[in-house]
Amino acid sequence: MKLVCISDTHSLHRRIPDIPDGDVLIHAGDCLGQGTLENVRDFNDWLETLPHRHKIVVAGNHDWAFQETPELAREALTEAIYLEDSGVEIEGVRFWGSPWTPVFMNWAFMLQRGESLYEKWQLIPDNTDVLITHGPPKGIGDEVMMGLKGQNVGCEQLLGRIQQLSLQAHIFGHIHEGYGGYRFGKTDLINASTCNERYLADNAPIVLDVHPQKG
């Protein structure tokens, strides 16, 4: 199964120069620019033009419509499977999606580090194959520059849960500077941020293959 991974498009989805075909298109959050229902409808119209047989979306901290008017936002997103602390199995591959990130200023889907996030990550089933979260785990694709010094701002509790799982892949975004592929044990980790740190949609979609588990 070929996964095509994007994230953090911030309503600039039409500026992505080329989106490879694949079995499942995954958007790891921050699909919206202003966070409005109109943004959701525009994003959905664009998804309809893409050839992928399956499309999965999780929300991010800019995606206010999914937090403030969740029923209306989900109704508007007819072209994708929306995951919020929920999962779906596609052709034998088990996906789980979650929007939460550690608190930073006043954005959507944010929780305090510690117990609140720990409880969310404990909802991830042990048999998950592909995890989709908006934010990164601590120390992987999560470095931002604070003055002259880099700082890892990912979630410690998410890293702890990943260490307990046998994931094939973990797909996220949120930290634009961390775009790229990483490896943690036997797990492929993908920071699929489409927009760079200047909010230009310059980063290419990342493609990877996963396989149904036997037995």
Region locations from a protein language model:
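Active-site-proximal loop/helix segments of hydrolase catalytic cores
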Residues: H10, I16-I19, A108-T128, I132-T133, ...
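Active-site-proximal segments of metal-dependent phosphoesterases and phosphodiesterases across multiple
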Residues: L32, L37, F104-M105, N127-Q168
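Core catalytic region of metal-dependent phosphoesterases/phosphodiesterases
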Residues: I6, S11-I90
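Binuclear metal-dependent phosphoesterase catalytic core
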Residues: G87-E91, Q157-L165, A169, H176-G215
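Active-site neighborhood of phospho(di)ester-bond hydrolases with catalytic His/Asp-centered motifs
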Residues: C5-S7, L25-D30, I56-N61, L83-E84, ...
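Active-site-proximal beta-strand elements of phosphoester/diester hydrolases
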Residues: M1-H10, G92-T101, D129-H134, D188-T194
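Charged helix-capping and loop-helix junction motifs
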Residues: V40-F43, L72-A80, Q112-Y118, L148-L159
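Short, conserved loop/helix-junction motifs that constitute active-site signature segments
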Residues: D18-P20, L47-H52, R74-L77, I124-P125, ...
